[in-house]
Amino acid sequence: MSKKLVQIKNLKTYFHTEAGTAKAVDNVSFDIYKGEVLGIVGESGSGKSVTSLSINRLIPNPPGEIVSGEIIYNNTNLLDLSYDEMKDIRGKEIAMIFQEPMTSLNPVLKIGVQMNEILIKHYDLNEEEATKKSIEMLEAVGIPSPEQRIDEYPHQFSGGMRQRVMIAMALQCNPSLLIADEPTTALDVTIQAQILDLMMDLKDKRKDAAILLITHDLAVVAETCDRVIVMYGGEIQEIATIEELFKNPLHPYTKALMNSIPHMERKTKRLKALKGMVPSILKMGDGCKFCSRFEPEECPCMGTKENQELFEAKKNHFVRCKKEMISV
């Protein structure tokens, strides 16, 4: 295994609301290795995006707060840095493609102004030099007539085009860690493939670069990732290599996700689905998060309603459920 690029230890990110404290990320620990693509999958509300925002120190406070934990990057705990020190890392060393392209761009500034800003700040380029590089990046992500489009406003771009602009901005500085939160949202499958290839090119150009890919699309995960984290209820439920996860999923929730994928060889008229909906994080409590979605004998707690510890079921394959459920 390569050297660790980022170590996340016992991360807790909570949101304090009138209805109570939402434990959006609750005691999460994992490593990101140099040169790897690590995927985080899970349903909406599982804590995927909050985890990524925590790494970049972008949790809105109030109501959010990183309560405790460590985020170690280059032997430095990012949670100990000042606001200005974090600004020197954000965008240059750790970049992010945000989930909402329709609202992530400033509507009153031209695309060129927003793209040039990061280059002027981190590389001390003048306006002309920054514009030239920004045009090259727009062309690289497949935006036609980039010399013209760079002087247009966000409302003149479609949702898919705005997403490509966001991706171009994130790749401007060849970051060590690219956090991609649903990077192919609003894109058709052809452009999805182009964007994923572009992200892989970044990793190939910079041998020690890593990608944290957040998605709900297991097909994208299978195509791009080296390892996968499955999240639910603000906690990690399973971690494994991509081959191991698809070949031998251990957690009941992971198995249910896999069974919900349509397969060509299966002649079924109806897709399998998990029972119910993801409950509010406020209503999950500290016990087992799955009791409302599984029958007691199939639930990770096996009917005890107690939350389970994450343990190593086999080498580099971690799972959070009763040990009696595991057959490796």
For each of these PLM feature ranges, what is it?
Residues K4, P144-Q148, T241-V328:
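Short catalytic/signature loops enriched in Gly
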Residues E70-N77, E128-Q148, M258:
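Conserved ABC ATPase "signature" region
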Residues L78-A95, K121, E244-P249, P279-G285:
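ABC ATPase NBD coupling module
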Residues M115, I167, L178, I191, ...:
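Hydrophobic anchor residue at the start of the ABC signature
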Residues Q172-S176:
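A short, proline-enriched helix->beta-strand linker immediately N-terminal to the Walker B motif
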Residues P183, L187, I191-K269:
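P-loop NTP-binding/switch modules centered on Walker-like glycine-rich loops
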